[in-house]
C-alpha cells in the first residue's frame, strides 16, 4: 500500500513496473474518487499523457476545476447513474449536456465519457444520452434529443410530435431526469425504509427529498398510459416491451412518491392518537399501497425479485461440483443479503450499509418491506426490542423465524425456501 504523503513516489514506482511489463505504449487508467491534494500529486509522477483519470461522479459532483482538468494527463467525464442498485427513475440529462461540453471547451485534457454505475437496469435513457455525447459536435438541444429518443423507443408514429408519448417524455426530461444536486442516485422510497414517522433516507448516504413537482410526473404517467394504442399500432414487439417497462417504472415512481405524502399524513395524524379514524385510514392506505405496488411490479420481469434470485441460483451451477446447498448459498448468503443487510451485523449496523442496495421489486415489497411496516404499526410504532437486523437477516437467510424475532436463526433447508418466480403475472397496462 501507499503510505500517507508518499503518493507521488508510489505512483511513480507502479508506473515504472507497468512500463517494464507492458512497454512504453501502455496507459494507466485510474479512478478519481474523493481525492485529496496529496493524491493529486500522482498526476505529475507519471509522464504526461500516460495516465487516464476517470472523474467518476462528473454528472453529480465534477472535480475538473479542482484539479485543473487533471492536466497534464487525460481525463474522462463519467457518470454514476446509480448507487447500490437502489430503485428509482432518475437522471441529470440537461446538466450532463451543459457540463460535458463546458469542460471540453475549458480543458483540452477532457476526452470522452464513461459510466461507473454500481448496478444497471435503471433508467436506460441516461445511458443512451451519455454515450451519444462524444458523437455530438456541440451541446445538443436536449428537448429535441428526447423527442428522437421516444421515437426510437416506441416508433416514429407512436411518438410523433405532440403525441401522448412525446409529451410524456418531455415532461420526464424536465422533472425526474433534470436533477441538479449532488444526490447519490435517485431520491429514496420511504416504503422501503426501516419504519419511522420521519424518513430522511432509506440508506445511510441517500435522501428522500423529492426534487421535482410530483403533479407533473403524475401527468407524464397519464400521458404514457394514453400512448398505449399508438405504441400497439406500431406492431413492434420491441416497442411494446420498451413501453411496458417504462409504463411500470414511471407508474411505480408516481406511487412511490405518493407513499411519501401518505407517511407525512400519518405523522400529522399520529400527533393526536393512534386510534383516530384518520390515522387508521392513512395507515391502511400506506400498507395497501405497498401491496398494490407489489402487484404492479409483478407484471414485469425486470421488477421481480425472482429475476434476481433465480439468476443467482443459475450462476451457482457454474461452480464445479455444485449442489442445492451451493445454490442456496448463492441466493441467500449473496443475492438476498446484498439487497437487505449487505452483510452480517457489523457492515449492516456499524458500517451503515443496511438497505444500501434496497430494491423496490415484487416479492420484496410483499414479503420484506410490508411485514416490517406492519409489525411497526401493530406494535405502537416501535421496532423489535433487539432492533431490525435479526428480522432482516432471518428473511434473507430463510430461517423461518417471524418478524420481530430477536435472534438470528440458521439458514433454512432448500425444501423450505420460498420460491420467487421470475415470470411476469398479469398485464402492465390493464
Question: What residue ranges belong to the model's regions?
Answer:
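C-terminal substrate/ligand-recognition segments
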Residues: 212-235, 249-271
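Short coil/turn segments at secondary-structure boundaries
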Residues: 164-170, 183-194, 238-247
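Extended, compositionally biased alpha-helical segments that mediate assembly or anchoring
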Residues: 358-430
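Aromatic-lined, polymer-binding surfaces characteristic
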Residues: 1-11, 237, 241-264, 273, ...
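Short, solvent-exposed, charged loop/turn and helix-capping segments
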Residues: 231-247, 296-314
Amino acid at each position: 500500500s501507499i503510505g500517507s504523503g508518499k503518493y507521488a513516489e508510489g505512483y511513480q514506482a507502479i508506473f515504472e513496473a507497468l512500463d517494464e511489463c507492458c512497454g512504453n505504449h501502455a496507459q494507466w487508467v485510474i479512478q478519481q474518487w474523493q481525492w485529496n491534494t496529496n493524491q493529486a500529486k500522482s498526476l505529475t509522477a507519471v509522464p504526461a499523457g500516460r495516465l487516464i483519470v476517470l472523474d467518476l461522479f462528473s454528472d453529480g459532483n465534477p472535480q475538473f476545476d479542482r484539479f485543473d482538468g487533471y492536466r497534464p494527463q487525460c481525463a474522462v467525464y463519467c457518470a454514476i447513474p446509480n448507487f447500490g442498485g437502489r430503485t428509482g427513475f432518475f437522471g441529470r440529462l440537461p446538466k450532463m449536456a451543459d457540463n460535458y461540453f463546458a469542460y471540453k471547451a475549458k480543458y483540452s485534457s477532457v476526452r470522452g465519457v464513461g459510466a461507473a454505475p454500481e448496478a444497471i437496469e435503471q433508467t436506460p435513457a441516461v445511458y443512451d444520452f451519455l454515450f451519444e455525447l462524444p458523437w455530438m459536435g456541440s451541446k445538443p438541444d436536449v428537448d429535441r434529443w428526447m423527442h428522437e429518443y421516444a421515437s426510437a423507443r416506441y416508433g416514429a408514429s407512436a411518438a410523433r410530435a405532440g403525441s401522448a408519448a412525446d409529451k410524456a417524455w418531455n415532461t420526464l426530461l424536465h422533472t425526474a431526469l433534470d436533477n441538479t444536486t449532488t444526490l447519490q442516485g435517485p431520491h429514496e422510497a420511504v416504503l422501503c425504509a426501516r419504519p419511522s414517522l420521519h424518513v430522511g433516507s432509506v440508506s445511510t448516504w441517500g435522501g428522500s427529498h423529492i426534487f421535482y413537482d410530483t403533479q407533473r410526473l403524475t401527468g407524464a404517467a397519464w400521458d404514457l398510459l394514453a400512448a398505449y394504442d399508438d405504441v400497439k399500432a406500431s406492431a413492434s414487439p420491441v416497442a411494446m416491451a420498451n413501453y411496458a417497462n417504462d409504463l411500470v417504472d414511471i407508474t411505480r415512481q408516481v406511487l412511490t412518491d405518493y407513499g411519501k405524502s401518505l407517511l407525512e399524513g400519518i405523522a400529522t395524524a399520529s400527533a393526536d392518537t393512534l386510534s383516530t379514524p384518520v390515522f387508521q385510514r392513512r395507515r391502511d392506505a400506506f400498507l395497501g399501497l405497498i401491496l398494490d405496488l407489489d402487484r404492479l411490479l409483478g407484471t414485469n420481469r425486470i421488477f421481480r425479485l425472482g429475476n434476481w434470485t433465480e439468476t443467482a441460483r443459475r450462476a451457482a451451477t457454474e461452480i464445479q461440483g455444485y449442489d442445492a446447498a451451493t445454490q442456496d448459498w448463492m441466493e441467500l448468503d449473496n443475492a438476498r443479503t446484498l439487497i437487505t443487510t449487505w452483510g452480517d451485523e457489523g457492515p449492516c449496523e456499524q458500517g451503515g450499509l443496511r438497505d444500501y442496495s434496497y430494491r423496490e421489486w415484487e416479492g420484496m415489497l410483499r414479503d420484506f418491506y410490508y411485514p416490517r411496516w406492519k409489525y411497526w404499526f401493530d406494535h405502537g410504532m416501535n421496532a423489535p426490542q433487539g432492533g431490525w437486523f435479526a428480522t432482516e437477516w432471518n428473511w434473507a437467510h430463510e430461517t423461518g423465524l417471524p418478524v420481530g424475532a430477536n435472534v438470528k436463526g440458521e439458514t433454512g433447508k432448500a425444501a423450505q425456501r420460498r420460491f420467487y418466480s421470475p415470470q411476469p403475472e398479469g398485464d402492465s397496462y390493464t
